[in-house]
Each structure stands twice: as C-alpha cells, then as structure tokens.
C-alpha cells in the first residue's frame, strides 16, 4: 500500500484533538514511514500576511490582498515553526518536490516572495508543521480503522472551504461520515 498523494480521512473514533475530524494529505510514503499535512485545521487568526510580516518580506502595493488573507493551516505537531506549502507546479523554488503531476510541495521561504504577485503558483495551501508516522505505523492505523483513505482531490485541497473538507473528502467516495458510529469493532 502506497498512500503518497492520498487523503487520510479521520474516522469518528479518533479522539485525539489534533487529528479529530481531520483530513491529512500524504506527501511522502515508503517502507520507512509517512509524512503528511493536515488540510482542514486553520491556525486561529493567522494568515499568509502574518508569515510575510514575520519573514520581513515587503508587501508591494500591487499585491492581491485577498491572497494574503488566506488562513495558514496547522499541518501537524512536528516542525511547527516550518512552512509546508502545497501548490500547483510552476518553476522550482529552492526546496520543491513534485508529489504528482498536479501537486508540488515547497519548504523553502523563497516561495513567499511570489505570494500575491503574478509569479505565485496558481493554487496554493500554506501550513505550519507536518505529521509523521514511523515504519508500519500508518498501515497499522489504517488496518485498525482509524483512517479512511482515498486518492487526493484537487478541488477539496484548494477550493473546498476548510471546515467542509472532512465531510466532503468522505463524500467523494460515497460515505456520509457523519453517519458512522464512533464505536468500532472487529467480528
């Protein structure tokens, strides 16, 4: 099972507040483990503009301010001081890796110089921090019904309102996740 470029959709049985009702985009998965970014947990009152100010990047007058007001997401509990930017492919930044034909991840701050300008990638999602699973850990969590998995969907990743992503991610595979009991078992 390779879950790279997939969503993990938290089952209602997950009680950990970090992952409760979460959707995680898996950007790396191998026999050694997996890494992903939560895509539906905004950081309260924290926007791309806050990051630009923190990095002391000058905001030009002709910048599209709507793009600067996009919320920054809590990507996970690890490296929470580091930016993880999912975006549509474009020219490469200092630290960019293509995940699929449609998605690139960048972890270098040079991408922020393009935000709100004509050089910005067409689609963009900014998160602080990431989530990580050790060798075999994610596979065990899937086997034990902690997650539903599905191929990543660009509409959900970039266009669906943040608070609707959990429900909508399950809906694309025909599941009304609100009707699943939090009590699970094996027969």
Swiss-Prot record:
- Show the GO cellular component annotation of the record: cytosol
Which InterPro entries does the UniProt record give?
Answer: AlgH-like (IPR003774)
Q: Which family does it belong to?
A: Belongs to the UPF0301 (AlgH) family.
HAMAP family (UniProt xref) = UPF0301
The record's section on PANTHER family has: UNCHARACTERIZED PROTEIN YQGE, UPF0301 PROTEIN YQGE
Q: What is this protein called?
A: UPF0301 protein WIGBR1650
The organism named in the record is Wigglesworthia glossinidia brevipalpis
